């Protein structure tokens, strides 16, 4: 019988088992700050890898998009069906300053609106605000029974649908092009555009559940820190007080204390 190495017997690895590194050890938490149009300003936290060499942490945070329920932003559970998108525009200290970047409805809310015996009317339009944001607004509406109507159905005719759609586009364009993005977001929250459409189209056919169901930002202007600070209103970061000193004023030379001398 030949004597030799038994290859089946496994050798122990050199150095033993490697200790698993904690993935959070090299990351930092940053606070997400919502614009001043919302009631709740501190909306959450986000993680980012620490600055290492040329890879700067703040650059990794910029243009990150957060989706938050309007119920959390307004502290109002009745607004839970709206989802607001906020985009990180600037980082100051440990705070991420965001701006509005779109809006959508939850799927369950949209499904609950669609019912039998009524007509669904949709319209969308591209608008440009006074501060050069290009948005696409999507509107949804449903017909309802007229006063004292006995008939079960409330279907609108094709000509009426076209008229209503034209009116929707007209109102959305007028209300969006006459204000900046901050003012427009203020109109989205209480659904003032939907109410205006409902009022204007009542002579054509009575409508119910009129909503701006979706907002997409197609084009944003060049980043301006001054405009962002206006959006955040009362936000202030803890910074040192600037000292004014004349150029010709001599600087007093004090004695430098050496620690451990």
UniProtKB/Swiss-Prot annotation:
Compartments, as annotated in UniProt: Cytoplasm
GO molecular function: structural constituent of ribosome
Coiled coil regions in record: none
GO CC entries: cytosolic small ribosomal subunit
Pfam families linked: Ribosomal_S3Ae (PF01015)
Keyword Cytoplasm among record annotations: yes
Keyword set, alphabetical order: Cytoplasm, Ribonucleoprotein, Ribosomal protein
Biological-process GO terms, alphabetical: translation
Compositional bias ranges of the Basic residues kind: 1-18
First-listed, main subcellular location of the protein, grouped into a coarse class: cytoplasm
Region span, Disordered: 1-20
Domain of life: Eukaryota
Assembly and binders: Component of the small ribosomal subunit. Mature ribosomes consist of a small (40S) and a large (60S) subunit. The 40S subunit contains about 33 different proteins and 1 molecule of RNA (18S). The 60S subunit contains about 49 different proteins and 3 molecules of RNA (25S, 5.8S and 5S).
Similarity section: Belongs to the eukaryotic ribosomal protein eS1 family.
Entry protein name: Small ribosomal subunit protein eS1z
Protein's organism: Vitis vinifera (Grape)
Lineage of the species this protein comes from: Eukaryota, Viridiplantae, Streptophyta, Embryophyta, Tracheophyta
